[in-house]
Amino acid sequence: METLIRKRPYIFILTLLLILMPAGCAQKAHVPEGFVYVKEVIPSAELDIRYYGSNNFTGRPVAGYRAPTAILSLQAARALANVSKDLESQGYAIKIFDAYRPQKAVNDFITWTKGADDSRIKSKFYPNIDKKDLFMAGYLASKSGHSRGSTVDLTLMDKKKGQELDMGSHFDYLDPVSAHGSPMITAHQTANRELLKTTMEKYGFKSYSREWWHYTLTNEPYPDRYFDFDVDE
């Protein structure tokens, strides 16, 4: 009995810790092994996770986005940290629009293409193409590299001004003007895109020809796996 009484304070403390720990460690509970939250690796990264809200080409929140956070494979996050460090030394910061994307979100895109157009959304994100043709044009796919966990959509910000660099088109503007090498943008806008591209390539990422914001780690750790866990905290 005396031993039990002595142990009670410790039992109470242990119980209290078990109650409080989920509040402090909930973030890690939702990330599978091999994945990390980008902000844990790159605290200076700005996040603007578009598919969590309605400011995207669907005009609504997308399935699987339960929090406005960014997740990547550990390898991709570390490589992106090198990108960020390099750019910060030049007065720039990275702003992330999307990173890991669950397969359920990709499926939601497919469902969306079968519905009616919203003229307001269409004019902002895909004015010169029908949504049913977005797959054929290479803007959407039934399997996305984002679901493998090593692809990121991002832009650059001027740290001093706190503004995005002018890239000639905005994120998710599904149009030829968003392609690398587009002749429809100015020399200054081309230089901004090239700064992002050369720095990303320097640290092991490859670009996607149709979208200036889209990069994938060349030596990605899960080249044949497509994940479906939610983007959550």
Give, region by region, the residue ranges found by the protein language model:
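Extracytoplasmic cell-surface/polysaccharide-interacting catalytic and binding patches
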Residues: 25-99, 104-107, 111-210, 219-233
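Intrinsically disordered, low-complexity segments enriched in polar/charged small residues
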Residues: 12-13, 219
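Bacterial N-terminal signal peptides that target proteins for export
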Residues: 2-12
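Short, low-complexity intrinsically disordered segments
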Residues: 6, 210-211
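Bacterial N-terminal signal peptides
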Residues: 13-22
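Conserved metal-phosphate-binding beta-hairpin within the catalytic cores
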Residues: 215
